[in-house]
């Protein structure tokens, strides 16, 4: 059974978003959400959830390279809990180590410095989070 999944790359100023299907295992970036000190516009997130009707949400979990938690880890977990509480959808956490670095190098390879716009980085990071989640499911 194919699932539609939305993924989020949590940040204090911007939250990347991507949508994907489990049947293809691929993700497509969506516009990033602005956030103020980690608090998103929940109405905008609600509209995206209503539009895509996901079966599941995935939130990137920022960890240090050694696997220990960093200051942003707890905030990402809190964001995941709030998604679950507000939208009554299952939420899973996905290790996101190196996704931002990987996203920046992918964007730079395609378009140089001009292409390194923050929203694009967040969207591609969310795609990488979702695609790595799909890989772990298979």
From Swiss-Prot:
Protein localization: Cytoplasm
Its EC number(s): 3.1.-.-
Gene3D superfamilies (alphabetical): YqgF/RNase H-like domain
Sections of the chain in a coiled coil: none
Alphabetical GO biological process terms: rRNA 5'-end processing
Class of enzymatic activity (EC top level): hydrolase
Gene Ontology CC: cytosol
Record keywords, A-Z: Cytoplasm, Hydrolase, Nuclease, Ribosome biogenesis
GO molecular function, one term: nuclease activity
CDD domains: YqgF (cd16964)
Nuclease as UniProt keyword: yes
Primary role: Could be a nuclease involved in processing of the 5'-end of pre-16S rRNA.
UniProt record similarity statement: Belongs to the YqgF nuclease family.
Protein name: Putative pre-16S rRNA nuclease
């Amino acid at each position: 059974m194919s699932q539609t999944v939305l993924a989020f790359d949590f940040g204090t100023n911007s939250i990347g978003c991507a949508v994907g299907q489990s049947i293809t295992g691929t993700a497509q970036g969506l516009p990033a959400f602005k956030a103020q000190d980690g608090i998103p516009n929940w109405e905008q997130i609600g509209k995206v959830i209503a539009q895509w009707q996901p079966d599941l949400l995935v939130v990137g979990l920022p960890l240090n390279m050694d696997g220990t938690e960093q200051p942003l880890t707890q905030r990402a977990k809190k964001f995941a809990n709030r998604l679950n509480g507000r939208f009554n959808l299952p939420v899973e956490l996905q290790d996101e180590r190196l996704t931002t670095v990987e996203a920046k190098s992918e964007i730079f390879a395609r378009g140089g410095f001009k292409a390194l716009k923050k929203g694009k980085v967040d969207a591609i990071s969310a795609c990488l989070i979702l695609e790595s989640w799909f890989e772990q499911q298979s």
